[in-house]
Every structure is written in structure tokens, then in C-alpha cells.
Amino acid sequence: YAGLDFFAGYPITPSTEIAELLSLKLPRKGGKFIQMEDEIASMCAIIGASLTGLKSMTATSGPGFSLKQEAIGYAVMAEIPCVIVNVQRGGPSTGLPTSPSQGDVMQARWGTHGDHAIITLTASNHQDVFAMTVEAFNLAETYRTPVILLFDEVVGHMREKLQMPDPEEIPLVERLWTSVKEGTDFHPYLPREDRKSTRLNSSHYS
């Protein structure tokens, strides 16, 4: 529904169910699922996938979210759209994998070094998770930035019935690609009527 093309992750409770389901369902729609060797590689993989034009996402929990911070900062600086899901669990360090917590809000805002804005959404039930996941991808593409989705262990492990809209009824923001002639300046922020910015279609990445 959100247009996800690529997922890279590393198993960590209580976010593992996201990876397990996507490993089955994402390839059916032509997407790519990769289990990486660690959390840092997972974040770097979705950055690389996004540079090629794919809508990309990873999912983790507190300790893994800490490891991803340097790469998240790079994605912010380089204006690379992607989505990071943090299914929060209790405690510092390894913590309590099956204990609910909402303690990573400050880290979502100020987890990396330097000063930058970040978009973070949080959901309290699965209907919100569905809607906010779509919104997260749209915001990432619109503002050319990583977007963080914060859930907790309760949301991560519970099951609910959802009201699923028709896919055609969901507005999706797609990336605008352009190309320029050699020797011509590229201006991604030139005003457009739709207020969207373009990305340079580089053969080095695609």
C-alpha cells in the first residue's frame, strides 16, 4: 500500500515479525528483502537502495536503533528518503526484549550528532500503524529525509482486524526524476507548481 520496494533488516525482538512477514510478502510484489549481517549494514543498505530510486525501509528496536544513528545522520545530510521503524522495548543496553516501553522519543529526535530536523510518527494501534506507514513514505519522498516510525512492544506483538481501503484510494508520493545535459547546472529546488523537488537520475546508481 505504501509502495515499499526494498527492506533490509537484522532480527531483534520485538520488531522481528515485521521482517518475517516482509520476507514472505515483499518478493511477491517484485520487491527485495535482505537480512543483513547487523543493524549498521541494514541502515546503509536502505540508503543505497533509496539512491537507486527504491522506496526502502528497515525495522529495529532500541539497541539496533542506537547502532543506526550515524547512518541516519548521513541520510539526513544527503537528503535520502527512507523509513526506519523502531519497535521500542524496555531498558537501556540490551534491555528487556519483551517489555513494552516508549523511551526512545528523545533518541528519535536527538540521537545523532549535529543539529537537524527529523520527522517522527508514533502509533498506538494497528489502524494507526497502517495509515502512518503510508504517511511516513509520503513524507520521506516529499521532504527528502528519513522518517522514523515509533511503535512499542505491545503494538508490535498484538493482532488486530483492520479496515483496508482500496489501494487506488491511497495517495502516494512518487519520486520525481530528472536529467540534465552535461555542463548544465542542476537546481533541485527550483520552484514548481506542485512544490515538489526533483532528484537527478544518475547512471552511477541506477
Predicted regions mapped to residue ranges:
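Short, solvent-exposed polar/charged micro-motifs at secondary-structure junctions
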Residues: 44-45, 131, 159-160
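Short, solvent-exposed amphipathic alpha-helical segments in soluble enzyme
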Residues: 23-25, 73-76, 134-139, 164-167
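Thiamine diphosphate
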Residues: 1-110, 117, 153
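Conformationally flexible catalytic loops at phosphate/diphosphate-handling active centers
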Residues: 147-202, 206
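Generic detector of well-ordered secondary structure
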Residues: 9, 48, 138, 144, ...
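A very general structural signal that marks isolated residues within well-ordered alpha-helical segments
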Residues: 52, 142, 204-205
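Conserved thiamine diphosphate
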Residues: 99-153, 165, 176-181
